[in-house]
Amino acid sequence: MKTRTKNLISLVLLSSCLTAMVGCNTQGKGKVDKDNLVFDKNGIVLDNFEGLGVEWGTYEDPDKLSSGSWERSLKIMDRLNPQVTRCMLNYDWFITNFDDKFDSDKSNDTWEYNFSNKLMNNTIDVLRYCDDHNIDVAFGCWNVPGSLGKDEYNMFTEVTSDARWATMTADILEYLIKFQGIKCIKYFVNSNEPNYSGVEGKSKNYNNTFEVWAKGVKNVRKALDDRGFNDIKIIGGDTTGFEGTIEYFNGISKNDELKEAVGDYGFHVYCPNMIIDTGDLAVRIRDIYNQVKKNDKDLGVKRIPHIWEAGLYDGKNAETDSNAYIANYSYGLRMADYTLQCAIAGVNSIVYWDFDDGMHFMYNADGTMTSKGWGMFSSLSTDSAMKQRLRPWYHSSVLLTNLMRKGSKIIDNPANDPEVDNTFRSMAVVDENNTYAGVVAINRGMLPVTKTFRVAEEFLSNATTPNKIYVYIYNEADLNIGEDGFVKENQVLDLSLKDEIEISVPQNSMVILSSKEL
């Protein structure tokens, strides 16, 4: 007969009830126990997670920012504490004095660069922050230079396979790395979403194919190596959508030369709610992973899977490239669920789209600009005070980015199988030195559920606070925001994660139990 010591805990000012229970119950063998969850070495999916981050690119018009917004943005970034980011720009911003010699021979074209402008200054500000805060950067260009309807550089036919693209890439990276001393650039993005071709006159990418993109990757690889940038990896794809991603990943995995030219399998996922809500996202990611693994045994070793743009598809307005649900609590819960499912499926890092509404714009036919509303807040002076507030999904992201650090172990459990339960998911996160651990529990159901959690004692062998559990609850009623405007714990328990902890997880909520303050 099992014996337990029960501790009832009152959560002041919370609408939900949480209890803690210490005991010796263990997960049974055979049939999956979906109520008593143990995280041990058998559940390790990743043993060297690379961290979470957010898209933080060059601000396309810094003059539109509100007074003091840059300083505020840095404080917001400080609290988010990402370990990876993606920084994109346009080469058009810097190319000047282009001369094609009035002939069809591209090899004798000449051009210069003007790096003394506000766009390069802002780019360097972002990259220096990343240097100072040990943030790995995927740096790249949205697409080949040239404006729609003009193609003044004659690059739309060959796209990134044009040899001049590789030269421009190496030139700009050389300026940043050798002349500006930037050290954080670890990856190069060989154009954004190359599989999204579009149509001539409305897209620079209309003539792109996998073969064209692959040729461009090889050109860029040689150009970077010739400049001594052998350690900068090229993202293997940066594709969007499941179907297009599978095409590119299979193409890479079956081509030995191309496999050696790229440094990861990188893609974008804007996921429909239904796929996340039912737990099917993890299933789909694993399916892609297993397909690639058949051809590339180094998947997960030499070439790591990354998601470089993570967002939700439902609520997207194609005309404004914004999401109508971005300020809802449900957006934050789904993005947390998205993150958990990708992590337990083996994705090694995830970059959220995106940080600030003030970064990117839609350029309209009448010459006006419309900001893309996907951010965690807005720094635009023209936006209302409401839009400039931190959105709920910023706070849920803060909790995850501060728990899921570089080098962490991600630990799954059998109860996450959607056939067992498609409304509840959980994982454990343990840092590389076993100094802290955390459990993330997400209830997508319509009713509260009671679960018990235990993290194997071996994962807390060097715990700095072995008998403390910081409890964080994310939902509209219980999210706890401190006087500084940032999320804080709901309660601190004098317990250990190596003991059995029983909690009631409210409906449509995330609960995090962490042995360190997040």
Language-model features, listed with the residues they occupy:
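Glycoside hydrolase catalytic-domain groove-lining segments
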Residues: 270-318
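Carbohydrate-binding surface patches
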Residues: 419-463, 508-514
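C-terminal beta-strand-rich structural cap/linker in extracellular carbohydrate-active enzymes
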Residues: 487-518
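C-terminal motif of bacterial Sec signal peptides marking the signal peptidase cleavage site
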Residues: 20-23
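N-terminal carbohydrate-binding accessory modules
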Residues: 28-78
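Substrate-binding cleft and catalytic face of glycoside hydrolase catalytic domains
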Residues: 80-275
